[in-house]
């Protein structure tokens, strides 16, 4: 962040020069500075934040993690990054860990073998980001590991991540004040006292100051109480208050994050303001989501401070079904255009019952063959088995693909809003057998 750091120095020098050289000289120097700054050869590449997974149930989330930086890299005039740090997880006895995702990150090309409480960890996925300031390329990395079993086994207590070493890259990044490293565990837990919630987890490694906007769709907000959003972000500086977090167009804040200083080295879970060059922030968004909303938009912006967003998670009390279908055991007989098959309609990843009489339409290619309906209410996590005999028209070839679509009235439209609208289909290849002619 030497560009930001140098901007601060420059402004300070302008104040001093004003005492001796006058306002006209200031204007000329500032114009020259802006001109040179705009001509700087700069480009950036990263991996945009996108939906990783959606989890539905009586769930909530929290973070545990820590920075490797012993001080903020800007304006500290020395290297600040260690290779180990610890944090404490403290869930209640009624909280049951459902998911635990470890993210670690730092400056440079990447350290993809670290230790967590003495267990060697290698990533399931990796992310990268780079910025080019002529003549150097500044790289950054993040890694992801599903450590659900480890956290379920360990439970509450101290978690220590070690052997995260970015020392080979620290001299280069020190020149721009972007030398950092840190880690965080995103924990999704179940508690029977919670309402049915929808958790959306997004990740990548996307640089801000470009505005990062996430549009949440397929919602049906039944209750806006305790709605919240959180994120894991890297490389923020508390001394550069130029960032905002908005929900549905409204700038929001919390006791740890002023409206104009979102990325300020804070941890909303512990209340610490010494999470240097890293943010684990959680915001209540109750007042910005309305009952009955079917969509929402959140956005993060930074106008000067260089930030990387690694993870965004939202929790909303959105209650909708999620119909899926699977076909099994298709049987045919020789010289017949009838097919008998079993099917199962499920409502597993949902927060509401699936009503009876949900339509199921069968297609041969693009031609509608038949429509049937579920018989009973399917509870959350439940399923219903069915059987049907289809008569295939003579216009359909002997070899074709049979497609089943649940929540389809026969013209490609459904009768309900679902949590996920693109998982309603299942297809299998069918061969009709005809006796050879002699």
Language-model-detected regions and their locations in the chain:
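First exposed extracellular module after export/assembly in secreted or surface-exposed proteins
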Residues: 3, 7, 112, 136, ...
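Extracellular/luminal regions of secreted and cell-surface proteins that mediate adhesion/ECM remodeling
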Residues: 318-438
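Short regulatory "switch" loops immediately downstream of catalytic or recognition motifs
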Residues: 1, 6, 35, 165-169, ...
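Feature targets compositionally biased, intrinsically disordered low-complexity regions
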Residues: 21, 45, 156, 248, ...
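Disulfide-rich extracellular domains of secreted proteins
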Residues: 45-333, 340, 344, 359, ...
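Bacterial Sec-dependent N-terminal signal peptides
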Residues: 1-47
